[in-house]
Amino acid sequence: MGVCMDARSELKGKRGLVRLLNATRYSLAGYKAAWQDEEAFRQICLLAVIGLPLACWLGRDWAESVLLAVPLVLCLLVELLNSAIENVVDRISLEWHPLAKKAKDMGSAAQFTAQLFLAVVWGGYLLGRLWA
């Protein structure tokens, strides 16, 4: 346990540019892990690669483009958090437990909610443009 605390203390002592560079490196490692291990993350990235330029093209101004982009980015964020929850639960134990199921189900529900939000925003926007 002392090793973990020493490592944590060493990381907490970093400040300024060193801390920022370390945080960036950890974030990039997180993206890499999600890309390699999570099919859902890759699917949402593909959706974002298509949807973000489409949002810029469809939006009549900056605000409309952002309105369409936010749900796409939200889905990416929620998938990263959902994957993190799943990994932590699996790290603790691979055995079935009602609390583990609850945590994973809640993460899944968060992603489902983000995807519903995406569908409502894009669907409403596109229908509004069709009937305008």
Question: Would you name each region that the model predicts?
Answer:
Residues G2-A84, I92, W96-P98, S108-A132:
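Hydrophobic alpha-helical transmembrane segments
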